[in-house]
């Protein structure tokens, strides 16, 4: 293929456009051979082998050298193996039934090499003109038709993942892509010469074949009108029936795909040619960017372009606006001294202590002072003072610089009005360390005075006037406070109860230290009168009840029952109080004596019942 501007000699060895395959790489690789067979692609390689081929054909030059050469030069099909061979076609087959072999592959992978498309097939213009002149003068109408620029665009998406064997007799240096663009504009007259003439016309046109493959390398040349973004892997081949030239291989019927229309009938009107140069440029640029993005193995990240500098306009409203001298008699609303007074103070007097960071007491310094009639403010002694932070830290501040512009919003802004010198704020020399001036009180009953007093209260209610403490100093009570015995749970005093065991009837009925028994412990008391029947006492209750009831003091806490673990421990190891002592025998003897005496008394009572 000879593109315009490519004047390389014909004797330069041409290279194939096919990328390096797995077999040729493994044959030269020093690594150990893989476990897979030699010609079988892996699953990853099958997934990655998807070729997008774009064929751009355009006739860049319409006028050729006059056909005055001799006819002694043989055709490039027989003279040079490195020229683009054109598969011939019999007259019986029309041009629309051209079959494309999508799976054709070179048989010997060891002889593959790589070269960009622009250097693959380079034929000299003189040889092309001589071979064109060999067709005879009877082909002149067809030549005029072929000289018209007729661009063609063919896009074929091929899946080459399947591993089919190539056709037999395939020449290893032949290209796999030929576009019969002009077959529809020719008449099939002679079986031999006309097919040979059509092959020469196709070779004369610059054909741009673009293949996007992961192994392709971008190569460009300065003399090309359309540089290719990557090397070519030929995706398909035009397979036709053989004619006179014996170099055309016989295609395998198993490798043929269904008949597709030609590129000229797809994208070009048959009557009037039309130019596709802008479309070719846009497609080429898009495909170049696509190949550069997706098929670059390791693309170094480039830093982003420097952004243009951003211009920010910040407008801050300062407390003193442009004042006209005609409006200087209007009174001020702000509770701080005027700005001109601060300007005079900054240049004439020593630096005073910095004002607080409150709402209205940081005043701006907007430049050189005007020679005004404002009275100077007495300077405060520069001494270290504690900073007024809300955090409560006690850091000692250094001597503060002169006050700076107050960029915070005023509580009561001036609103562009001046301040009368008669109502200048009066500052005393005994003011605190933080510079604070009290403005003179305006007229009574005015709303300005109320606003002034409200601003004062707002300043004094700042959190800096409060005593701040750390949270860790507060004691967190984890256990509740025990209740006092002389107070009720509500905090009321308890009634004093008598520590008695025997109560009179009056005390009981007057509810003095008496608690009515609950339903669970309804005991009969001594006040019940038993009835005597047949010499026996009958009580109202059916069960045996206790006569004496010990009333405990309710103010005293109840004795808690020992837990089960304490009981078991006490049963195993006796306490010293419960341990047997040496006086147990004497105590038992005394108890037996008392029992004997009691029995004797009962017997005597039975014998003499009248004594009761």
From Swiss-Prot:
Annotated positions of the Phosphoserine modification: 307
Record flagged with keyword Protein transport: no
Disulfide bonds: none
Start and end residues of each stretch annotated as Required for the interaction with GRB2 and sufficient to promote the phosphorylation of AKT and cell proliferation: 85-405
Composition skew (Pro residues), residue ranges: 243-252, 366-379
Region of interest (Required for nuclear lamina association), residue spans: 136-392
Keywords of this entry: Acetylation, Chromosome, Myogenesis, Nucleus, Phosphoprotein
Region (Disordered): 1-48, 65-96, 119-150, 206-256, 323-405, 444-463, 553-583
Region span, Sufficient for heterochromatin association in interphase and chromatin association in anaphase: 1-135
Residue positions where N-acetylmethionine is found in the record: 1
Subcellular compartments: Chromosome; Nucleus; Nucleus lamina; Nucleus, Nucleoplasm
Biased composition (Basic and acidic residues): 448-463
Record-level GO BP terms: muscle organ development
Subunit annotation: Interacts (via proline-rich region) with GRB2 (via SH3 domain 2). Interacts (via N-terminus) with CBX5.
Protein name as catalogued: Proline-rich protein 14
């Amino acid at each position: 293929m000879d593109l315009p501007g490519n004047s390389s000699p014909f004797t330069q060895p041409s290279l194939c456009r096919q990328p390096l395959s797995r077999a040729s790489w493994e044959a030269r690789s020093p690594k150990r051979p893989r476990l897979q067979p030699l010609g079988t692609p892996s699953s990853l390689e099958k997934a990655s082998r998807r070729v997008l081929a774009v064929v751009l054909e355009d006739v860049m030059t319409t006028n050729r050298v006059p056909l005055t050469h001799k006819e002694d030069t043989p055709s490039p099909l027989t003279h040079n193996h490195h020229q683009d061979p054109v598969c011939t076609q019999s007259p019986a087959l029309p041009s629309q039934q051209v079959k494309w072999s999508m799976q054709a592959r070179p048989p010997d992978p060891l002889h593959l090499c790589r070269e960009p498309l622009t250097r693959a097939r380079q034929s000299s213009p003189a040889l092309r003109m001589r071979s064109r002149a060999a067709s005879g003068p009877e082909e002149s109408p067809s030549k005029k038709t072929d000289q018209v620029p007729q661009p063609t665009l063919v896009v074929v998406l091929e899946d080459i993942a399947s591993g089919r064997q190539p056709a037999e007799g395939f020449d290893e240096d032949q290209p796999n892509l030929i576009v019969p663009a002009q077959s529809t504009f020719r008449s099939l007259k002679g079986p031999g010469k006309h097919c040979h003439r059509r092959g020469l016309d196709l070779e004369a046109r610059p054909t741009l074949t673009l293949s996007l493959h992961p192994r392709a390398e971008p190569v460009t040349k300065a003399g090309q009108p359309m540089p290719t973004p990557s090397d070519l892997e030929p995706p398909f081949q035009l397979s036709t029936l053989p004619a006179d030239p014996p170099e055309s291989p016989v295609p395998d019927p198993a490798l043929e795909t269904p008949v597709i229309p030609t590129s000229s009938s797809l994208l070009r009107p048959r009557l009037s040619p039309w130019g596709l140069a802008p479309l070719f440029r846009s497609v080429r640029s898009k495909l170049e960017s696509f190949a550069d993005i997706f098929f670059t193995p390791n693309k170094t990240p480039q830093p982003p372009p420097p952004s243009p500098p951003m211009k920010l306009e910040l407008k801050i409203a300062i407390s003193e606006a442009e004042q006209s001298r005609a409006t200087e008699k209007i009174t001020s609303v702000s509770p701080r001294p005027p700005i001109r007074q601060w300007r005079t103070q900054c240049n004439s007097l020593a630096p005073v202590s910095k004002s607080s960071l409150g709402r209205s007491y940081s005043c701006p310094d907007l430049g050189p002072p005007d020679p005004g009639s404002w009275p100077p403010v007495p300077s405060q002694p520069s001494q270290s003072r504690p900073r007024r932070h809300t955090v409560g830290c006690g850091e000692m501040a250094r001597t503060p610089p002169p006050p700076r512009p107050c960029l915070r919003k005023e509580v009561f802004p001036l609103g562009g009005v001046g301040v009368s010198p008669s109502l200048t704020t009066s500052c005393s020399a005994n003011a605190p360390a933080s510079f604070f001036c009290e403005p003179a009180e305006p007229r009574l009953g005015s709303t300005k005075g109320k606003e002034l007093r409200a601003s004062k209260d707002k300043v004094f209610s700042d959190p800096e006037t409060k005593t701040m403490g750390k949270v860790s100093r507060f004691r967190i009570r984890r256990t509740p406070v025990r209740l006092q015995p002389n107070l009720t749970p509500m905090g009321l005093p308890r009634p004093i109860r008598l520590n008695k065991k025997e109560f009179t009837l009056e005390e009981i009925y007057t509810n003095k230290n008496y608690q009515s028994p609950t339903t669970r412990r309804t005991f009969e008391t001594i006040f019940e009168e038993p009835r005597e029947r047949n010499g026996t006492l009958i009580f109202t209750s059916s069960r045996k009840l206790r006569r004496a009831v010990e009333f405990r003091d309710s103010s005293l806490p109840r004795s808690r029952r020992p837990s089960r673990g304490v009981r078991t421990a006490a049963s195993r190891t006796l306490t010293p109080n419960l341990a047997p002592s040496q006086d147990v025998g004497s105590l038992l003897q005394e108890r037996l004596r008392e029992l004997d005496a009691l029995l004797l008394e009962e017997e005597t009572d039975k014998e003499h019942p009248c004594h009761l």
